[in-house]
């Protein structure tokens, strides 16, 4: 009991922690600034987490209007969770919100694709894909150098508010 149930082999494993950039951060940086405001990351793998718990998290993200980064979106045997997640999020936001499919980030075959939530095709996604679903305020811009997706932080609302009033007071007046 003093060893905490850890095997001799496990005690010999060295754990090294190194700072880095996560796939969701890389996907956002490569595609604009979709993570410019509140966001969450949800694994769609139900190998260690019951699907009911994952569904609850997706509903919470939808109700909170968070940008959602899905990792472990599909596997060879697990193809239904991403479609279910799409349907859940469409209860909270329109099918026209931008979606980024970021595959093989940092590898020679890296690929960034832009879709909408309603147009998300599960067959375009594999285990090396990070799926980023925009919030209701996220926008896609088609620029001269390609597309970009961003999520505004709301500063424009504060800049447009009448002087001397807080934003929530202004919204109550309208």
Spans of model-derived segments:
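A contiguous loop/helix-start segment that scaffolds small-molecule binding in enzyme catalytic cores
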Residues: 63-174
